[in-house]
Amino acid sequence: RLPQSIRTQEILLQNGTVQDCRGCSYEACRHFAEGGRCFYGGAVTEQVLPAVQQADAVLLLCPNYNDAVSANMTAFFNRLTNLAVVRELWDKYVWAVVVSGFSGSDLVARQVLGAMCLNKAAILPPRFCLLQTANDPGAAAEAENVGTKLDVFAKSIVDTLLP
């Protein structure tokens, strides 16, 4: 739904290889970050943080796990501190798609807002979050008016990034 003029890169956090931050001191975190790495290494240091640093925008796909983002998404939010201590993120746009079984989409959206905007200072544009209810696997893609919702959501991304 996004035009080819918007280059995308998909990074999966679902394979369980994302190690959460264990809370280095600010000085230690900054020391490693200045060298372009994190003490805990792995996919976050090698793929995720460099991709975020190069990106103009980040689109997060957030399934609702018991009214919360996934453990890997939480680890991403926490490990993003390693980039934020050496480079301001105030010029990065963030959008999210939240899919919930019955309820709690608003809680997940608030976690994205808190982690990415309030804590990391990224930009969350108006209507940054698309919320969808889906009770069964694959049901989100078949939901009523989902195509129209996605078109409107994609247009808002394009209008923001390519004014």
Language-model regions: role of each:
Residues 1-85, 138-163:
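N-terminal beta1-alpha1-beta2 submodule of the flavodoxin-like/Rossmannoid cofactor-binding fold
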Residues 13-15, 128-135:
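Short beta->alpha junction loops
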Residues 89-131:
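Short, glycine-/small-residue-rich phosphate/pyrophosphate-handling segment
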Residues 96, 135-138:
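Short beta-alpha connecting loops at secondary-structure transitions
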Residues 117-121, 133-136, 157-162:
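Short, highly charged low-complexity linear segments
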